């Protein structure tokens, strides 16, 4: 999944934001479960970007 920037997120409406948030949380959960099973993080940079994107989406949702 491509990382979303603030400008792209601000162009979305509420329904799109909620859908994107659900997708990001599901993707993050998959990374967490993989790393728990393997004992090592597959791609820590990607996990960090997903967390930050989730935070961006939540921040913009709260602004609206």
From Swiss-Prot:
The keyword Ribonucleoprotein applies. Keywords: Ribonucleoprotein, Ribosomal protein. One of its GO terms (biological process) is translation. GO terms for molecular function: structural constituent of ribosome. GO terms for cellular component: ribonucleoprotein complex; ribosome. The keyword Metal-binding does not apply. It holds the Pfam family Ribosomal_L29. NCBIfam families: L29. Belongs to the universal ribosomal protein uL29 family. This is Large ribosomal subunit protein uL29.
């Amino acid at each position: 999944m491509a990382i979303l920037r603030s400008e792209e997120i601000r162009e979305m409406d509420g329904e799109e934001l909620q859908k994107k948030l659900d997708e990001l949380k599901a993707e993050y959960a998959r990374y967490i479960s993989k790393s728990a099973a393997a004992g090592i993080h597959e791609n820590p940079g990607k996990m960090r970007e997903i967390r930050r994107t989730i935070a961006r989406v939540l921040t913009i949702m709260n602004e609206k």
